[in-house]
Structure formats: structure tokens, C-alpha cells
Amino acid sequence: MPLSYSAAAAAAPSPLAARSRGLLRRPPRSSPVVVRCKKIDQLRAVNGIPPYAPVSNRSLLSPVTLPIIRDANIKNDTRLRIFSGTANPSLSQEIASYLGLELGKINIKRFADGEIYVQLQESVRGCDVFLVQPTCPPANENLMELLIMIDACRRASAKNITAVIPYFGYARADRKSQGRESIAAKLVANMITEAGANRVLVCDLHSSQAMGYFDIPVDHVYGQPVILDYLASKTICSDDLVVVSPDVGGVARARAFAKKLSDAPLAIVDKRRHGHNVAEVMNLIGDVRGKVAVMMDDMIDTAGTIAKGAELLHQEGAREVYACCTHAVFSPPAIERLSSGLFQEVIITNTIPLKEDKSFPQLTILSVANLLGETIWRVHDDCSVGHEPYSSLDID
């Protein structure tokens, strides 16, 4: 039986399906895999879900030719403005290209003492402004830049200001696990609100409860549909598939993911953590012998948890192990662990820009630009963003 989505997921309508067509190709496995498409064609929706867009290999903010899927008359909507911070300009450009818009003109620079200067170089008075800026490493600098961008838009009389944060830094500091600790996620939420944002758009928060830290509306979308689409295109027999949660805390996410992949069985790696960035795998709950194991998590930081989990899966007889995540933080020694031969493939998205020295042959990068671009348009057009697959994976 071929690998496919569940019937419920396959039946879910998509606004992209009626407008998109084209060809997706993968380069040879001898180099890091980046999903690309013919620039003259539009992307094809598979099973009624949004396709994965090409990932630009440009590191600087410059025009790129990408397929425009959204209606061309968006260009006539002069109230919609998209500005990019310096954290991930290539993703911002892809989002703007999806919407058929040009990025807003903005001047961002650093003074000699490290202070950040932001000046909007076009009017935003009465406009619906979206600021694309993940707070990825260096988290403090990117966060401060976002706050100053929000303040600049507020003082320039923007009607609505939405902070589009593909990766929300400090999301893991969402509770007090020990006495006298800070809940930094709540502090950052307060700062964004006080700076003047009217709304926040985030992708794959570490815990959904963190949405409650904001006193303004939060649109929470999941990057997993992009990964699901890619996995469904691979020739993996559904009877051989098992989805693995690398820890107990990710069971709900992995269960929702497994349900979409032909309702695959679920396994759980039980671990004990002895300090920050250190994980110890204890045992496996479930059967992976002779199976293709797909490990799903929201992020990979040092890769300690997922690498030790992969070792355990191989010991328990797994035939192949895939690692999937939305946010590739990849702090040292993540690259060494992920490229050590434990994984058949490491599948990530581009919510965080990846430097060239962090690439390796098993790496596949998928783009969330279409996902975020469609959500931005729905927010601007006062449409629901709760339509599958844009926000919900039925995670409970």
C-alpha cells in the first residue's frame, strides 16, 4: 500500500489547488538537497494541500524569480505592505513573490556601538503592515530589531502592524521548571505588544500554551503540512512506516503527524534530561523493528535528543531513520551528529536561515513561504486562517 494522507486530509480543500500546477524536482543526493521547481511554472498542490516552494540560495535581499500563485490583482492593493528584517531576507522575498508584491523599502543598520537604526523609506500611513523577522540566533539582536521595526511603523501611523515571526525565540522558556526562574517567553510577548504590534503570526510554537502569553490576537500555523507533502511524495510503503516522538513532550505533535501519514503507528523515545542541552535516552515505547522510522519534532537545536533517539531506533532494528523538524537551530555539535550516518535524511524548513557551512548531504530544506504568504493574505483580507492545512493539525 503506497504512503498517502488520510482520507480526511486528502479531502480538505485548498485555495492553491485550483491555481497551481508545475513540476518539482530534486537534485542528486551527492549534494545537500534543496527542493526547487522550474521558474516558469507554478507549483502543484498534492492531495489538496499547499506545495513546498523552492528555497532560494541567495543570502542577500535581492529580486528573485519565483512562481506567483496568488491573484495578480493583489498588486493593486496599496494598503498591504511587507517589510523584511535582516534575520531571514530570502524567506521574506519568497513570501512577497508568492503574493505578487515587492518588499517595502526599509533602512536597517548597526551603529559602531551595536545600536540598531531603522527607518521606513516609504509611507505606511493607514496601511496593513506585516514585518517578517524570526527571532533566531542571534536572538537578542534580532528581537531588538523587530521591536524597533514595530515602533517605527507605529510612529509612522500604520493602521495595523502584524509581527510575522517564523521562529519565535525564547519559546522554550515558557514555564518555571525550577525556583527563581524567569518565564522569558511571557516577557518577550509583553515586549512585542508594548512596542505596538496589533497581531502576531507565528509558526510552530514550542508549546501552544505560549499563545496565551500575548494580549493581542495570535495566528499560529504549523509547518508540518509542508513536510507531510514531501514525505507523501516518497516511495515509502505505509505498512513499513512508524512515526517516532523523540520525547514524551512531543507525543501530541507526533500523533497528529502520524494520523496524516496513513494513520501510521506511533513510537515514543523515553528520555531523562540531566541539564541544559544534554539528553539521555532511556528506552523505547513501541515497535520499530524492520520499519522506516520518521522522527518528528518542532525544532532541532544541538541534536542531542534526536541523535540519541536514532541510535536507540537502530539498536531496536529500525531499517531507516528520518529526522523532521520545522525549526533548524543547529547549534554545535548538531551538524556532526546529524551527518554521522544515523539518518537517511534530515528534513527541515527555512524558518531559520541556514549558512552554507551547516549543510550536509542528507539535508533537505523545504520552504514555508507559500504557507506564510497565504496566511498573511487571509489575515489582510479578514478571512479565516483556521482552514486546514494552514493552521491546525488537530494537536490536542
From Swiss-Prot:
What catalytic activity does the UniProt entry give for this protein?
Answer: D-ribose 5-phosphate + ATP = 5-phospho-alpha-D-ribose 1-diphosphate + AMP + H(+)
What PROSITE patterns does its record include?
PRPP_SYNTHASE
Instruction: Give the organism's phylogenetic lineage.
Output: Eukaryota, Viridiplantae, Streptophyta, Embryophyta, Tracheophyta
Q: Which GO terms describe its biological process?
A: 5-phosphoribose 1-diphosphate biosynthetic process; purine nucleotide biosynthetic process; ribonucleoside monophosphate biosynthetic process
Annotated protein name in UniProt: Ribose-phosphate pyrophosphokinase 1, chloroplastic
Q: Name one Pfam family in it.
A: Pribosyl_synth
Q: Where in the cell is it found?
A: Plastid, Chloroplast
* NCBIfam families the record matches: PRK01259.1 (NF002320), PRK02812.1 (NF002758), ribP_PPkin (TIGR01251)
Its keywords, alphabetically, are:
ATP-binding, Chloroplast, Kinase, Magnesium, Metal-binding, Nucleotide biosynthesis, Nucleotide-binding, Plastid, Transferase, Transit peptide
Q: Which domain of life is it from?
A: Eukaryota
Question: Which InterPro entries does the annotation name?
Answer: PRib_PP_synth_CS, Pribosyltran_N, PRibTrfase_dom, PRTase-like, Rib-P_diPkinase, Rib-P_diPkinase_bac
- Entry similarity comment: Belongs to the ribose-phosphate pyrophosphokinase family.
Reported EC number(s) for this entry are: 2.7.6.1
Would you tell me the Gene Ontology cellular component terms? chloroplast; cytoplasm; ribose phosphate diphosphokinase complex
Which residues make up the transit peptide?
1-36
| Region ranges (Binding of phosphoribosylpyrophosphate) | 290-305
Q: Which residues bind Mg(2+)?
A: D204, H206, D215, D219
The molecular function GO annotations come to: ATP binding; kinase activity; magnesium ion binding; ribose phosphate diphosphokinase activity
List, separated by semicolons, the cofactors it needs: Mg(2+)
The cofactor note from the UniProt entry for this protein is: Binds 1 Mg(2+) ion per subunit.
